[in-house]
Amino acid sequence: IDMRGEHTLLVCCMNLEYYLVENWGTGYGPDNQSEHNKQRAKVSKALAKINADLYGFVEIEQGQSALAELAADLSKNTGRKFSYINDGGSANGSYTKAGYVYCSDVLEPHGSLRYNNEGVDNRKKTQAFREKATGEVFLYSVNHFKAKSGKGSGDNADKGDGQGTYNGDRVREAKSVLNHYGSDSYYYGDEDILIMGDLNAYAMED
């Protein structure tokens, strides 16, 4: 399947469902090395099949090891050079984050990573990239909004209207992304933005 078509860049965003390279057995993600190997093989195969120039991930382990592993797999499996955005953090239990892997043959980072910590920290970020062939710059915002699981109260309660629980939190997160866009676009010096992620928003969402 040709997903690129006539476009010069292909961007992919994916929830990796707790991609952990350590801190196993917490009830989230793999319980051991064998399970991680299976997850890694499936994820890496899927990413190589897509063969995007830029990947945004959510539910990938904090720290740099998980991103480095997938960048190395993409380089090996596609014959192109991939790198990742190092946010300077370290692994902290089974906590996950939003992260970036990009083809350094095609793109280069423009400016530093920007954080939006409305809600859970490390799950909403923006990074600008420059396309080497054209010099064009764009912002890529990767986000993971609050899920519908659990019981909420107040504006987070399930109102029975199809939005499920924690709609209030998701609305606040969505507004925060829009609010951060102004300062992010000023910082990067460019207004073109691509917003992607697991927003946990379905047809009935506000």
Regions found by a protein language model. Give the residues of each.
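Divalent cation-coordinating acidic motifs and surrounding scaffolds
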Residues: 1-206
